[in-house]
Amino acid sequence: MENLGDLAQGLALLGKYLGAGLCMGIGAIGPGIGEGNIGAHAMDAMARQPEMVGTITTRMLLADAVAETTGIYSLLIAFMILLVV
């Protein structure tokens, strides 16, 4: 009977770690794709209008920060899964 309790505790830990890993892994896909698109379009815009490099860079960094928020939220949720559950 004692082994059954250890098995249940081990499965609970497995679920917790697997859930946090999936949360972070899947939650990082969107920001990665979004930031890549932002960077690609910013480079295209800088190649077309070299005189606007400063403005384009500023807006690119701001858009990257906004795109990264979902990754940060998934990191916070992963930490909550690890520490609270």
Curated annotation (Swiss-Prot):
The record marks E68 as: Reversibly protonated during proton transport. Keywords: ATP synthesis, Cell inner membrane, Cell membrane, CF(0), Hydrogen ion transport, Ion transport, Lipid-binding, Membrane, Transmembrane, Transmembrane helix, Transport. The keyword Ion transport applies. CDD domains: ATP-synt_Fo_c. It is found in: Cell inner membrane. It is a multi-pass membrane protein. GO terms for molecular function: lipid binding; proton-transporting ATP synthase activity, rotational mechanism. InterPro entries: ATP_synth_csu_bac/chlpt, ATP_synth_F0_csu, ATP_synth_F0_csu_DDCD_BS, ATP_synth_F0_csu_sf, ATPase_proteolipid_c-like_dom, F/V-ATP_Csub_sf. It comes from the Bacteria. SUPFAM superfamilies: F1F0 ATP synthase subunit C (SSF81333). One of its GO terms (cellular component) is proton-transporting two-sector ATPase complex, proton-transporting domain. The chain crosses the membrane at residues 10-30, 65-85. One of its GO terms (biological process) is proton motive force-driven ATP synthesis. PROSITE patterns: ATPASE_C. F-type ATPases have 2 components, F(1) - the catalytic core - and F(0) - the membrane proton channel. F(1) has five subunits: alpha(3), beta(3), gamma(1), delta(1), epsilon(1). F(0) has three main subunits: a(1), b(2) and c(10-14). The alpha and beta chains form an alternating ring which encloses part of the gamma chain. F(1) is attached to F(0) by a central stalk formed by the gamma and epsilon chains, while a peripheral stalk is formed by the delta and b chains. Belongs to the ATPase C chain family. F(1)F(0) ATP synthase produces ATP from ADP in the presence of a proton or sodium gradient. F-type ATPases consist of two structural domains, F(1) containing the extramembraneous catalytic core and F(0) containing the membrane proton channel, linked together by a central stalk and a peripheral stalk. During catalysis, ATP synthesis in the catalytic domain of F(1) is coupled via a rotary mechanism of the central stalk subunits to proton translocation. This is ATP synthase subunit c. It comes from Thermotoga maritima (strain ATCC 43589 / DSM 3109 / JCM 10099 / NBRC 100826 / MSB8). The gene is atpE.
